[in-house]
């Protein structure tokens, strides 16, 4: 009798395990549309981070004395690297003319800055552009 119970137990276990080895059907999700109220699509504004929003303003067209890195001054002769470093080290500025109050500027440097006032702008400090040392070394090498 014990042998028959053992044999029946082993056979039942084998039969149960054999069912798991076969391929199972994919579970079909039921549709809840019949239970739910029809949904109306909502028009949403495309999300935009603060850095991209600032780039769409005057900041993207001129050099922002509070947020731009040193390399942006390369395109203007005489500003890179000495004046650019002084401008960035003494930021923030409330208006473009404040850059003339930098300590240790020569008359020639002041004239050079004045001649480039139309290329400068001042906006509020943006952490995305000022965190770490990105204003001095933004990691772009030629």
Curated annotation (Swiss-Prot):
Annotated family: Belongs to the PsbU family.
Record's function text: One of the extrinsic, lumenal subunits of photosystem II (PSII). PSII is a light-driven water plastoquinone oxidoreductase, using light energy to abstract electrons from H(2)O, generating a proton gradient subsequently used for ATP formation. The extrinsic proteins stabilize the structure of photosystem II oxygen-evolving complex (OEC), the ion environment of oxygen evolution and protect the OEC against heat-induced inactivation.
Subunit field text: PSII is composed of 1 copy each of membrane proteins PsbA, PsbB, PsbC, PsbD, PsbE, PsbF, PsbH, PsbI, PsbJ, PsbK, PsbL, PsbM, PsbT, PsbX, PsbY, PsbZ, Psb30/Ycf12, peripheral proteins PsbO, CyanoQ (PsbQ), PsbU, PsbV and a large number of cofactors. It forms dimeric complexes.
Keywords: Electron transport, Membrane, Photosynthesis, Photosystem II, Signal, Thylakoid, Transport
Topology term for the membrane: Peripheral membrane protein
GO BP terms, alphabetized: photosynthesis; photosystem II stabilization
Record Pfam families: PsbU (PF06514)
Signal sequence interval, chain numbering: 1-29
This protein's name: Photosystem II extrinsic protein U
Compartment(s): Cellular thylakoid membrane
InterPro entries referenced in this protein's UniProt entry, alphabetically: PSII_PsbU (IPR010527)
Main location: membrane
A GO CC annotation given for this chain: extrinsic component of membrane
